[in-house]
Amino acid sequence: PTNSRPNPGYFKATIGRIVRYQAVLPSGQTTYENATTVDYGSRRVLLGETLAFQPKSGGIPLTHESHGVGSLVFGQDGTLLVSAGDNASYSSADGGSAAETYWSSALTDGILQAKENVGAFRAQLVDSLAGKVLRLDPVTGNGVESNPFYSAAEPRAAKSRVWALGLRNPFRMTIRPGTGEHEPELGN
């Protein structure tokens, strides 16, 4: 409610942010099924608290026009899964500082750290949110203890939120219960 209208002339790096609101129970209803409004006072930023802070932003870095934030789905365990592309250029072999990306403003604005200016290789950096599937607690936005790189001392750190890494452009996800393990050797 406090954001201004998008500026179509804005060409700089920014972040992907996930915000949660509580729906308002419709008058005379006992369920939220037909809810059409939210309580703005319930706003909670799960990911991307600030555009930039030192040493860097808490959001998914967006340095190019594609391969950005993809899907949100809930796992069967209630966790929130978020897909995010590497946000590297699709028109060149982006190993960092690609001319058609906004890497320079991302560094200046604290959206990227210098070690993250590696283009598509961000997907391999456990301390970057780019090129990942993130697994979050849907109430707090913290990483989940069973995530592979979780740190109890830093539950909001990028590594604590990483569920899978090394992904170029995971722009769509779905949960298909009963489809089995993801291990190929199990044959299902």
Per-range role (PLM):
Residues 1-188:
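Surface loops at the rim/top face of extracytoplasmic beta-rich domains
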